[in-house]
A protein has these predicted regions:
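Phosphate-binding loop of NTP-binding sites
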Residues: 1-146, 150-160, 214
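Adenine nucleotide phosphate-binding catalytic loops in nucleotide-utilizing enzymes
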Residues: 119-126, 140-141, 156-215
Length: 215
């Protein structure tokens, strides 16, 4: 996304007729080879949430392939090549990069004003996320923050399973009785569709990570 048409190296290979792919297009092509492809999107929290998903999948012995935007200690970098049908990646909206992906499941953490060097305004950002949802196949899974403004416009009429998380009691997954230790690490009671599913204790700080972990 950071390389534009005036980049001299890009211009040179295009002049020679050499095929090129953006990073997002390459990830999209890789994604097509996996039966279960999870794309984690949102203005904030993508790297943290992708890392949390990675840790859970590894703990479950599911041997996923991972592409994450930061260095993750458990995989010794930002890429892990697994041996299963599971692929998990961050999905960035900048330059509509995530519209090159082929996910079977999507996570949308939040939608706020960002990348205004590319998007005109928040409405254009929302439109991009709506187009992202449309890339899900029929029967796919959308996990989305119930607090997103005018949520129904993002979800649209897509024929997929929708699971919500957030502060609202009408969310499928929500946190109650949030408390913090002396290092600001939260714990909370996890409610799944109103039913108590146990106490969750996080090793990372801040309320925002309560909602990242719910996703």
């Amino acid at each position: 996304a950071a390389i534009h048409e005036d980049n001299p190296e890009l211009a040179a290979v295009q002049k020679r007729g050499i095929p090129t792919l953006t990073r997002a297009q390459l990830l999209g092509e890789i994604m097509r080879n996996y039966g279960q492809a999870v794309a984690v999107a949102g203005t904030h929290g993508k790297t943290t949430t992708t890392s949390m998903i990675t840790d859970m999948l590894l703990a479950a012995g599911l041997n996923p392939t991972i592409s994450v935007g930061g260095i993750l200690k458990d995989i010794g970098g930002n890429i892990r090549v697994g041996g299963s049908e599971l692929f998990v990646t961050e999905a960035c909206e900048y330059t509509n990069s995530f519209l090159s992906f082929y996910p079977t499941a999507e996570v949308i953490l939040n939608i706020e004003e960002d990348h205004l060097d590319f998007f005109k305004d928040i409405q254009e950002i929302r439109h991009s996320f709506g187009a992202f949802v449309k890339r899900l196949p029929d029967g796919g899974l959308l996990v989305i923050n119930s607090g997103i403004d005018r949520l129904e416009e993002i979800v649209g009429e897509k024929n997929c399973r929708v699971v919500t998380f957030g502060k609202g009691e009408d969310s499928d997954y929500t946190a109650k009785n949030i408390a913090y230790d002396e290092f600001a690490r939260p714990s909370y009671d996890l409610l799944i569709r109103g039913e108590d599913a146990g106490r969750v204790t996080l090793g990372v700080t801040g309320e925002h990570n309560v909602y990242n972990s719910l996703a």
